[in-house]
Amino acid sequence: YLAAKHQIKEIQERENLSFWENKLLEHPDQYPYLAKIASANTKLFSYTGEIRYLKSAELSLIALNKKTINAGHLRALARNYISQHKFQESLTLLIKAEENGENLIATQKMLFDVHLELGNDTKAEKYLKVLEQSNGFDYLIRASKWSDERGNLDRAISYLQRALAIAEASKNDELLLWSYTNLADFYGHNNQIKKSYEFYLKSLELDPNNAYAKKGIAWIVYSYENNPEESMRILSVIQKNHQSPDYKLLQAELAEYMDDEKQKKKYLQTYLSAVENEMYGEMYNQYNAKLFLEEYSNEDTALAIIKREIANRPTAASYDLLAWATLKNGAVRDALTIAEKHVVGKTYEPEALYHLAEIYKANDMPEKAKRLKDELVESSYELGPLMAVKIKQI
């Protein structure tokens, strides 16, 4: 699959984009063509990772929504904003679409997604209950996400397995691909590494150029097989056809693991140069905040980013970063106060639990730190070898 060079879907979509752009030039009054152009750009973003396609899709959808009061077009722009981490803007559009009432269930699915991303758990749960009546694929994948957010990974996997059965019965490649990659992720989080690998391979059988699945395999090769050189090779091959700044962060981690400080600095600088592109907006806030905190000890810059992220997205994950930055600043009691109010019992992500353990340790609460340490040892694969060393030191 690494040798897969023919980007057939990408080539076809570029031709499709060119066709509709030319049609619009010939007939500027035919604004429905904007939807076709936006769809082609969105697919090209998915295939290439190039942010310009996502931003081009946004412009077409904004123009389209000025011409219509169609709920489907509102949802399309809301979906684009979700990809850009513009969750507040997405919510505003979805509320309009809900008032419109057209294909209401499609809007309600997205309202669940956005409320969950914004940390509005009560509202998210309300929409999940509305969707429950269908018990279909779209409900099951959301019930899975909800269970995972609540720390119940076994139930999350069970919901996804049921969703996969529906996808297999429908023979819908898009649903199958979504099921395979997400099950691969969850099996990995559950330390079922062989199953995780098998499902990434199933994804590649359907789509040999799927960068997400290849990145998942690169992580297995690094974190489970302890082969950073091969993992680095996989990442280098992926980036020939798919561009995303976060590949550089993983390569920097691999370089650190291989004791190559010079190469690590180079990858981090390449990442920072990439995310300076204004088109990325708020998409990499959490990555950037952690980088400035942990690699550059630049608490002021990190704190400014974290405060922006909390304003955009007041989730437990955002407040976890605030607590972590506060600890790094030496205000150990304040860090504990923030964590107890906004993080404890609200997220079960291993990285947040690691931060919490360090906060407990700094506040002379060894029993609580030890309980989390025991839990974190189970998450060593998901967190990676470098973090596994830090966990042992708690």
PLM features per residue range, with description:
Residues 1-74, 92, 125, 370-374, ...:
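N-terminal leader/linker segments that initiate helical-solenoid repeat arrays
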Residues 13, 47, 54, 87, ...:
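TPR-repeat structural position
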Residues 23, 63-64, 96-97, 128-131, ...:
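Canonical positions in the second alpha-helix
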Residues 31, 67-74, 100-108, 134-142, ...:
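Generic helix N-cap/helix-start motif at coil->alpha-helix transitions
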Residues 39, 79, 113, 145-146, ...:
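Residue-level recognition of tetratricopeptide repeat
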Residues 44, 48-51, 84, 118, ...:
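Structural motif corresponding to the intra-repeat A-B loop/turn of tetratricopeptide repeats
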Residues 132-136, 165, 239-245, 253-259, ...:
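TPR/TPR-like (Sel1-like) alpha-helical repeat modules
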